[in-house]
């Protein structure tokens, strides 16, 4: 579309394109709601539209290391902010995109035959994904759903109980990175996209093939080349099986009860 063409030609920055698309989605969602409420049909063509991630090789210092990830998650825990902790963890441990997190519904959460919680992602480009949630994260998610009394619909909402938007999650993350950078617990400010880059890098360094990671995260294989520099430098010197980033469910339980 025209946004991608402008980004590729250098006439528009990637971040500006993302913001413009977000605005268009919000406007069309309003029009759709208004039109349907007045008994007419409206096709929201922007509902499933998204911009591809920037196609470039990431430098070795582009992503947070294991200590920085721990500092971020610990800050959310210390603030008793279970929603922030869960949102950050879904990116870091499962590589979900910002948009996917905002679009999560309770109906997508299910159990497989072995009793593990899973996310049945809706089809995108005619491709479905069935993602097993790590046990520690599954415990936290289950606790969160019960504590928030979520019966159906959006898993994450704003203070007005409307579905959270991508700019809301970015602001939420920024509220933590601002403090952590000042406290020298982060090297720089990170975005939701940066956290996803870290998640994918962990998967690749843990031995998963580019095709396997691409399939799991819902992107095309060509995007995997952007992580070559990070993998070669091996700045995150741990296995990328996400069990290496352990989460303590007992502390979450304590926070919810408080």
PLM regions and their residue ranges:
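N-terminal core-binding DNA-recognition domain of tyrosine recombinases/integrases
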Residues: 1-58
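DNA breakage-rejoining catalytic core of tyrosine-based enzymes
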Residues: 53-70, 125-135, 150-152
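Basic, Lys/Arg- and aromatic-enriched nucleic-acid-binding interface segment
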Residues: 68-98
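A short, basic/aromatic helix-end/turn motif that makes direct DNA contacts
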Residues: 103-109, 214-221, 229-236
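Conserved tyrosine-mediated DNA breakage-rejoining catalytic core shared by Y-recombinases
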Residues: 103-139
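Active-site/catalytic core of tyrosine-dependent DNA strand-transfer enzymes
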Residues: 134-186
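Short, basic (Lys/Arg/His-rich) helix/loop patches that form interaction surfaces
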Residues: 174-215, 219-220
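DNA/chromatin major-groove-contacting recognition/catalytic segments
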Residues: 226-258
């Amino acid at each position: 579309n025209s946004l991608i063409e402008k980004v590729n030609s250098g006439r528009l920055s990637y971040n500006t394109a993302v913001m413009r698309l977000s605005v268009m989605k919000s406007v069309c969602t309003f029009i759709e709601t208004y039109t349907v409420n007045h008994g007419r049909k409206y096709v929201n063509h922007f509902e499933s539209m998204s911009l591809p991630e920037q196609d470039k090789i990431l430098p070795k210092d582009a992503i947070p290391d294991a200590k920085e990830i721990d500092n971020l998650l610990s800050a959310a825990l210390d603030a008793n902010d279970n929603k922030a902790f869960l949102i950050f963890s879904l990116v870091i441990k499962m590589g979900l995109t910002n948009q996917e997190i905002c679009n999560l519904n309770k109906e997508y959460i299910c159990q497989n035959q072995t009793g593990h919680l899973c996310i049945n992602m809706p089809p995108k480009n005619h491709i479905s994904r069935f993602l097993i949630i790590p046990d520690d994260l599954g415990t936290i998610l289950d606790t969160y759903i019960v504590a928030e009394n979520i019966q159906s619909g959006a898993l994450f909402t704003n203070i007005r109980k409307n579905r959270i938007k991508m700019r809301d999650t970015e602001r939420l993350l920024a509220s933590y990175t601002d403090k952590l950078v000042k406290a020298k617990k982060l090297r720089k400010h990170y975005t939701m996209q940066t956290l996803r880059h870290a998640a994918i890098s962990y998967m690749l360094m843990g031995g998963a093939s580019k095709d396997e990671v691409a399939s799991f995260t819902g992107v095309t294989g060509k995007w995997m080349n952007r992580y070559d520099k990070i993998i070669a430098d091996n700045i995150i010197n741990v296995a990328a099986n996400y069990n290496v980033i352990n989460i303590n469910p007992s502390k979450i339980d304590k926070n919810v009860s408080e």
